[in-house]
């Protein structure tokens, strides 16, 4: 038995399959500081506790794009490790804010499969949902990717 995760191939997916991604992630001050430093983001809501409180938050929420990247990354080993390309994203929403100290987890459901005419790959459609430690949905999106098959014709 190999300890290397080979990821899922097109044939490994089935419509309705629910994937609980194994790793949770607690958002740290370091995550937020590095994100702001690397991106140059200066949205006042995400950079200032005072402004966040003036806008009705107890503390500053993290940037939604950072939330997307932290949560989306949880799905890579299970869904897109064998992707030829991520083809698209749709219906992205951030229903609830995420704060430093929150722990997020991710589940994905396969909602569609379409074998490509080349016989070497197929498109996998998934609906992914990220939740915080209280079960509140913090990220909801659909994506589709071109995924390799185990055997190429």
Give the residues covered by each predicted segment.
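HotDog/MaoC-like acyl-thioester-processing domains
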Residues: 1-15, 98-103, 107-153
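Hot-dog-fold acyl-thioester-processing enzymes
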Residues: 1-88, 150-153
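Mid-chain, well-packed structural core segment of small domains
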Residues: 82-87, 91-100
């Amino acid at each position: 038995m190999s300890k290397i995760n080979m990821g899922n191939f097109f044939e490994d997916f089935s419509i309705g399959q629910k994937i609980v991604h194994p790793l949770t992630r607690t958002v740290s001050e370091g995550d937020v500081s590095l994100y702001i430093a690397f991106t140059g983001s200066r949205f006042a809501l995400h950079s200032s506790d005072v402004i966040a409180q003036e806008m009705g938050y107890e503390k500053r929420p993290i940037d939604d794009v950072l939330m997307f990247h932290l949560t989306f990354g949880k799905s890579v080993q299970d869904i897109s490790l064998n992707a030829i390309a991520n083809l698209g994203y749709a219906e992205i929403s951030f229903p609830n804010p995420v704060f430093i100290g929150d722990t997020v987890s991710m589940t994905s459901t396969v909602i569609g499969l379409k074998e490509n005419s080349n016989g070497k790959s197929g498109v996998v459609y998934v609906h992914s949902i990220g939740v915080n430690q209280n079960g509140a949905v913090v990220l909801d999106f659909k994506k589709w990717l071109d995924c390799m098959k185990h055997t190429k014709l």
